[in-house]
Amino acid sequence: MRAVVVVTGLVVVVVTTTLSLQDHDVKSASSPLSSSVDQGSSGDDCDEGLPPPDQPFRVVWNHPDNCEKINLHLPLDEYGIIFNKRRVFLGEEIQTLYDTGPWPYINKTGCFINGGLPQLFNQPDNSETCKILGKNRIEDFTGLGVLDFETWRAIYSTNFGTMENYQIESVNLVRKRHPDYSEKELKMVAEQEWQEAARKIMTDKLAAGQSLMPRGYWGYYLYPRTWDSKPDTKFRNNKIDWLWRQSTGLYPSIYIYYDVVSKTDSVITKFVSDTVGEAVRVQNDFSPPNTPIYPYVMFQTMDNVFHKEDHMKISLGLSAKMGAAGVILWGSSQNYKDFTTQCSRLQ
């Protein structure tokens, strides 16, 4: 039996699901770092792995709440919710890292920062990333290490919409060198160059975290994710198998973005099932042994509207049933602009 804690507004609901060892697709091993990784150091092997599959589903708190500073106590421990000591955002249980050193990107005005494109990024070593990550280094860290970079995507073809400039400029970069190439040839070379450059940047960043805190469970927020259809999702995610082979944690997002009254249970169930299901597939096909899945979950909108209790039960309960090791309850600093009010509502 697993007790799944669902936090929704002032109510904490315990959803009980029956799970046996066979319910889990998590591979057993002594360490999530026991197999080799691509393009980076995984650090020393260790004897300590995840709890056995029949251990409680873990709910991890990742909110910048500051509630204790105003003497408002959130009794997370009473409900088995795991949190960093002193409620720091970067702590011993979880670190969601937004600053991991320089990244190439195109800003809102079209300026190329740090080269703009991964292909033009010129960083001879990982020293700056190691320096920044080292500021939050915790000796014997065995928590969740999550790198969060969302300005462009690792898979070339998924840089569409507001990210389309990355495809356009990648093609232009090839055209400057090969003006005689056909449009098809330009796009083919642009994609190849993008994938190679993005791979080096992302694996180097991941390796920096793994070398500094080798017993942590390292991966990228939003990876893996789903796309238009299951075949399309599988095809695209298989292109970055190098990322799954190096990651020792998988951190997809099952955030529900919507007017809280507008989505049906079936729509949310399909979304959660597809997203967690793809993470399980990636885990089975590529991941090092004992790599955990921790979907990111929000229990309120950016407008501070709490999600429906039934929808939270779906998000957490289905994640547990499908084999995730736990979930991460994430909260935005935007929700805490008036943290006195927010803390009172949570309490």
UniProtKB/Swiss-Prot annotation:
Residues 28-43 have a biased composition (Low complexity). Expressed by the venom duct. Residues 1-18 form the signal peptide. Keywords: Disulfide bond, Glycoprotein, Glycosidase, Hydrolase, Secreted, Signal. One of its GO terms (molecular function) is hyalurononglucosaminidase activity. It is found in: Secreted. Disulfide bonds join 67-343. Residues 27-49 are annotated as: Disordered. It holds the Pfam family Glyco_hydro_56. One of its GO terms (biological process) is carbohydrate metabolic process. The active site is at 150 (proton donor). Contains 4 disulfide bonds. The keyword Disulfide bond applies. Its EC number is 3.2.1.35. Its main location: secreted. Belongs to the glycosyl hydrolase 56 family. Hyaluronidase catalyzes the hydrolysis of hyaluronic acid (HA), an anionic, nonsulfated glycosaminoglycan distributed widely throughout connective, epithelial, and neural tissues. In venom, they are known to enhance diffusion of the venom by degrading the extracellular matrix. This is Hyaluronidase conohyal-ad1. It comes from Conus adamsonii (Rhododendron cone).
